[in-house]
Regions:
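Conserved beta-strand positions in repeat-built beta-propeller and related beta-rich domains
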Residues: 16-24, 68-72, 109-113, 155-159, ...
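Structural motif
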Residues: 23-30, 75-77, 116-118, 161-165, ...
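Bacterial Sec-dependent N-terminal signal peptides
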Residues: 1-14
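A short beta-strand motif characteristic of beta-propeller blades
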Residues: 38-51, 83-90, 126-137, 173-178, ...
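Short loop/turn segments that connect beta-strands within beta-propeller blades
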Residues: 34-36, 80-84, 121-125, 168-172, ...
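Solenoidal tandem-repeat scaffolds enriched in leucines and small polar residues
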Residues: 125-228
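Short coil/turn segments that connect the beta-strands within blades of beta-propeller domains
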Residues: 11-12, 63-65, 104-105, 150-151, ...
Length: 287
């Protein structure tokens, strides 16, 4: 039975992208109703009679649509968030990771295994250009999450990288870069215009190196590191997120941790303890 109920109201639910297994093509989309506390699985497949694809990496809401980035299928689907039906797609991407909207007609799409960030027109579902990322080859190319400060977009470079890039959105050029620790995995901007990124430090035997992870606070205006919070070897922090007020950080390090953005040290006790499960993704209810 592929019938699925149409949602009478948007704004009271949570979309969950289920990555699936790399090269198995078994990614799915689920919808959790926060009012009824019920979940619908396979909503994309049931609404469109087609599979979502190979590795559902991320999803962004913009312009009344849900934009699902399917990494190893080289595609971004735009769906109606009420009916879950596809309304368009952007194809011929290399290995997309995240999409950041500048306007109704311009967005950036980060990639892995490509030394370019793609420029797309979401209104026409077309690729319109590229941003060359310095110091990368196609094989080592890796750009991830994006935040914006004025006319500049900042992006963290993750796999076998150790930098943040600063992009001028008027020229679509990289105008500056900042070295941080090995493999910054995520990037957010707090209410004080401070960026936060967390590194995983690589792994033992990595050709790129291995070090203890760190959490960095970076001033968006000066693009300089203000604070480095060091973890110990063996830690594997990831998934930095902010609350709705953008004054409190959350991140995964086996447990879930919570930290005010004005703190001068990392917390010593977790917010939610690890209990017979493996935390992998994290999102914070803005309310």
């Amino acid at each position: 039975d592929r019938e699925i109920a149409v949602r009478p109201e948007v704004g009271h639910g949570l979309f969950i992208t289920n990555e699936g297994n790399f090269q198995y093509g078994n990614a799915t989309l689920s919808f959790y109703d926060t009012q009824t506390r019920k979940i619908d699985n396979e909503v994309f497949f049931r609404a469109n009679d087609q599979k979502l694809g190979d590795v559902a990496q991320s999803m962004t809401m913009y312009g009344g649509l849900g934009w699902i980035v399917v990494n190893n299928s080289h595609v971004i689907f735009a769906i109606d968030p009420v009916t879950f039906k596809e309304v368009g797609r952007i194809t011929n991407l290399t290995s997309p990771r995240y999409i950041h909207f500048l306007s109704d007609e311009k967005a950036y799409v980060t990639q892995i295994w490509d030394n370019r960030i793609f420029i797309v027109n979401p209104k026409r579902f077309e690729i319109t250009g590229y941003i060359d990322c310095p110091g990368m080859t196609m094989e080592t190319g890796s750009t991830e999450q994006m935040v914006q400060y004025g006319k500049y977009v900042y992006v963290n470079c993750w796999s076998y990288q150790n930098r943040l890039l600063k992009i001028d959105t008027e020229t679509d050029k990289v105008v500056d870069e900042l070295v941080v620790g090995i493999q910054p995995t995520s990037l957010v901007m707090d209410k004080y215009d401070k960026m936060w990124t967390i590194t995983d430090g690589g792994y033992e035997g990595s050709p790129y190196g291995h070090e203890a992870p760190s959490l960095y606070r970076i001033d968006a205006a000066t693009f300089r590191i203000e604070k480095q919070f060091k973890f110990k070897f063996g830690d594997w922090p990831s998934e930095v997120q902010l609350n709705g007020g953008r004054d409190t950080l959350y991140f995964i390090n086996n447990d879930i941790w919570r930290m005010p953005v004005v703190a001068d040290h990392v917390p010593v006790r977790p917010f939610l303890k690890y209990k017979q499960t493996k935390f992998y993704g994290l999102s914070i209810d803005p309310n």
